[in-house]
Amino acid sequence: MDALTTFDHIIINANLATFSAQYGFDTYADNKDSISAAAKSTPYGQLENAAIGIKDSKIAWIGAHTQITPYLTHYQSQQITDADGHWITPGLIDCHTHIVYGGNRSNEFEARLHGANYQDIAAQGGGIVSTVRSTREANIEELFAQSEKRLLALVKEGVTSIEIKSGYGLDLKTERKMLKVARALGDKHNIHVSTTYLAAHALPPEYKDRVDDYIEQVCQWLPILHSEGLVDAVDGFCENIAFTTEQIKRVFEVARSLNLPVKLHSEQLSNIGASALVAEYQGLSSDHLEHLVEDDIKKMATSNTVAVLLPGAFYTLRDTKLPPIEELRKHQVPMAISTDCNPGTSPLTSLLLAMNMGCTLFYMTPEEVLAGATVHAAQALGLAHKGRIEVGCDADLALWDITRPADLAYQMGLNPIEGIMIKGAWR
């Protein structure tokens, strides 16, 4: 029997943005010494008039539409999707989110616009302490229901994999509750969820003036939650207003002992060596990066650490310090884009809008931001079989009614999704 007759599902008459090096994708071809690299690169790794064969939830074959048409009679109609010349990308990946939380902080948003500053809001029990309080008070069913709405908003725009952090519990009971909700969201909606332990996010009120004592607790909770199957990676907030590199290093040492990958909120407000620390531990990603310097970029390039850029926070905070995009290009550091969905500084549940912000605010190209929401986002989560349309990769795909891939970053407020495939099944 011919191999082209044995797929579980086939997609025909499609244009593909593969983001695969096998099809010429190379974001940084223009930054390489070889002139031929740029000449050989294909924007988006695109293939036109193509077809895909899917078997056992994986991409099993990619070829020309004309190659598969003689075999269509071997398939039932429900096994065939005619893309009608529209574009297919890898399913989008939101690689930095805080979507599991309780409460709402729109009152603080309003207060700031009436002139209140951070200190005023904090004095009234607002800020992150407000979210911690609401998250602790919510039971697991309430927390799931609130968080599910945010997840589904992202899925409706083509997101098939998502990272979800803890970090609004700041005690063992609530950190566990948050991570359980994250797992449950993935299970219910058949979407890949990468969980990240972020207890080193802020200092809880009960540990005021006892930062080192709290970090000791963070280190003790990690093996417990990992043993319960709740932790895929470890994160921290490394800033003058949060935790020092030495304190984060203590957490990273525990992560290393458990063979857990690390990442870090780095260089958002200042530079205290956070990205250099991530690189020292061969971390998956360093995130925010407005104050990143070239020496640390070189270290990230050596450690293959992804730069995760978060324009939603930049926008919400009205920041003016741009991340060093040109230097990241120069040293060929992969750049990812994410919503950073959180209640305080980026209440954003649109990865498409984050991509547009990456172009408009950070001067990234449409190809860079779409790569940043697919292949580079997958790298930022250590997901080797996601983020590309390539034989052997997971069949997580998004079908779009667009004329060219750049439309996804160009349009605002219009969702051109036509179909979402997760693990080989349309939803």
Curated annotation (Swiss-Prot):
Record-linked CDD domains: Imidazolone-5PH (cd01296)
EC number(s) given by UniProt: 3.5.2.7
Membrane-spanning parts: none
Pfam families noted in UniProt: Amidohydro_1
Chain residues that bind Fe(3+): H96, H98, H265, D340
The record's free-text note on cofactor binding: Binds 1 zinc or iron ion per subunit.
Catalytic activity: 4-imidazolone-5-propanoate + H2O = N-formimidoyl-L-glutamate
Residues annotated for Zn(2+) binding in this entry: H96, H98, H265, D340
Compartmental location: Cytoplasm
Single GO MF annotation: zinc ion binding
Keywords attached to this entry: Cytoplasm, Histidine metabolism, Hydrolase, Iron, Metal-binding, Zinc
Signal peptide from the UniProt entry: none
Superkingdom per UniProt: Bacteria
Chain's role: Catalyzes the hydrolytic cleavage of the carbon-nitrogen bond in imidazolone-5-propanoate to yield N-formimidoyl-L-glutamate. It is the third step in the universal histidine degradation pathway.
Family affiliation: Belongs to the metallo-dependent hydrolases superfamily. HutI family.
Name of this protein: Imidazolonepropionase
Species for this entry: Psychrobacter cryohalolentis (strain ATCC BAA-1226 / DSM 17306 / VKM B-2378 / K5)
Organism ancestry: Bacteria, Pseudomonadati, Pseudomonadota, Gammaproteobacteria, Moraxellales
Gene designation: hutI
